[in-house]
């Protein structure tokens, strides 16, 4: 409860307005709309370079850390209807990226790895749909 009050007080002092956007900005978490856009690009963008550029530009514009993006995406992808083997592989690749980030690996390299993991997941889903 104290943490919530501290967050609300900090948000009010910084922005003089307490909204979802200002709270997320104050605590440094990516906003839901940003994560939705990133997940949309990861699931639907066929051009790897374009996907990388979209996400990288958003990260720079909003000051987002890839580790925070990974955490938020992890929460959401459990709601996506992936086949179990695809979801397991995707979660393993995401956890590997998070571990490499924690050990000091480049965010650009790990962003590319994250995009590659989703491209791989999409290919496995398409192959599974074709063979079913």
Predicted regions and their residues:
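AAA+ P-loop NTPase domains with strong preference for DNA replication initiators
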Residues: 1-132
């Amino acid at each position: 409860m104290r943490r919530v009050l501290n967050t609300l007080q900090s948000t009010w002092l910084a922005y003089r307005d307490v909204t979802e956007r200002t709270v997320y900005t104050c605590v440094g978490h990516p906003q839901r709309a940003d994560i939705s856009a990133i997940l949309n690009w990861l699931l639907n963008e066929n051009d790897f370079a374009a996907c990388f550029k979209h996400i990288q530009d958003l990260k720079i514009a909003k000051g987002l850390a890839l580790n925070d993006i990974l955490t938020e995406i992890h929460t959401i992808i459990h709601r996506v209807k992936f086949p179990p083997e695809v979801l397991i592989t995707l979660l393993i690749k995401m956890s590997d990226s998070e571990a490499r980030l924690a050990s000091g690996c480049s965010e650009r390299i790990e962003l590319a790895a994250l995009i590659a993991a989703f491209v791989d997941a999409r290919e496995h889903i398409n192959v599974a749909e074709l063979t079913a």
